[in-house]
Amino acid sequence: MSDIDPTVRADPLPEDHDRALRPQMLSEFVGQAEARANLKVFIASARQRGEAMDHTLFHGPPGLGKTTLAQIMARELGVGFRMTSGPVLAKAGDLAAILTNLEKRDVLFIDEIHRLNPAVEEVLYPALEDFELDLVIGEGPAARTVRIELQPFTLVGATTRMGLLTTPLRDRFGIPTRLQFYTEDELFIIVDRNARKLGAPADEGGAREIARRARGTPRIAGRLLRRVVDFAVVEGDGRVTRALADMALNRLGVDHLGLDGADRRYLRLIAENYGGGPVGIETMSAALSESRDALEEVIEPFLLQQGLIQRTPRGRMLAQKGWTHLGLDAPRAQTDLFEG
C-alpha cells in the first residue's frame, strides 16, 4: 500500500529507474542483516499492538537502501506511504499540509532530513512527541497559536550526514539505524537476481565481476548491471559473462576496485599536484570543480573505507595503498611515515 503524492515529492531520485528491481518485502532484501533483524521485530511489535511504529532514522552513505527500507516498512505495516525531502519543506505550512493529511499509523519518509529549515524543524518536534501541531496564525499583537491534533504516524528520516542533524531532532528518533556498505557476496546475489529480472541472465563470473566493482553499493551495482546488459545485447549474445562484463566496465572507466574517472582524478590531484598531501578539502573542491559536499558524501567514503586516502587535521593525504593503485611511488618522506 503506497501512496506517493507527486506534490510532496522531491526531484526524481536516481534509483527511480530501478524501481522494478527493488525488493518489495524484508524477506527479499539482501544485506544489512542486523538492521533487517531489528526492523522485523519492531514492525511485528507495532502490528500486534495496533500502534504506529516508533520514529526511525536511517543514516549512512548514499545508495544503500534507505528509501527502499522505508517503503518496505510501510508495506509490511500495511499502511500508507508518503515521501518528501528536507529541501522541499521550505515553510512550516508545507509540513503542516502533509502531516494533516496523514492517515492513522501512516509512514512519512523525509529524505535529506539534515537539510530541514530550522523553522520547519521546530514545528516538527511536538508532532513527533505528542502528535500535535502548533501553528501561529497572524502577526504581531493579533497573532495566536492554533493547536491541531494529528493522527499517530511514523516518521522515517534518511540522511547521509548524521553529524549535521541537530541533537534535539536526532534524539526524537527511537530507532536510529546505520546502514553499512555491502559485501561482494551480498552484491553478487543482488546482481544475479536483477540480471534475471532484466532478461539477461549472468553467469557467476559476470555477476561477480559487476559486484566486485560496485563500491559496496546496490544502487551502483544496478546502474553498472544495466550498462553491461546494454553491451551484452548489442555486442554479445544477450548473456552477461565475465569477459563481457570486464570489457564493458573497462570501457565505462570503472577499474577493478570500482573507482571511476572522478575517483582517479581525486587521487591523482593529491599525488601529482600536492606530493601526496596533506591538502585541504576546500582546495580539493576548487581544483576539481566539485562541491565540498560531493567530495565528502560521494567520493571520499569509499576511498577511506578502502584505505586509499587518510583524513588528517591538516587535510587529505594519499595512503600507501593509494600510491600503489595509481602505480606511483610514494615520496621518500611519506614512505618513512608509512613504515614508521
Curated annotation (Swiss-Prot):
InterPro entries: AAA+_ATPase, AAA_lid_4, DNA_helicase_Holl-junc_RuvB, P-loop_NTPase, RuvB-like_N, RuvB_C, WH-like_DNA-bd_sf, WH_DNA-bd_sf. Residues 1-182 are annotated as: Large ATPase domain (RuvB-L). DNA binds at R292, R311, R316. One of its GO terms (molecular function) is four-way junction DNA binding. It comes from the Bacteria. Residues 183-253 are annotated as: Small ATPAse domain (RuvB-S). This is Holliday junction branch migration complex subunit RuvB. The lineage of its organism: Bacteria, Pseudomonadati, Pseudomonadota, Alphaproteobacteria, Rhodobacterales.
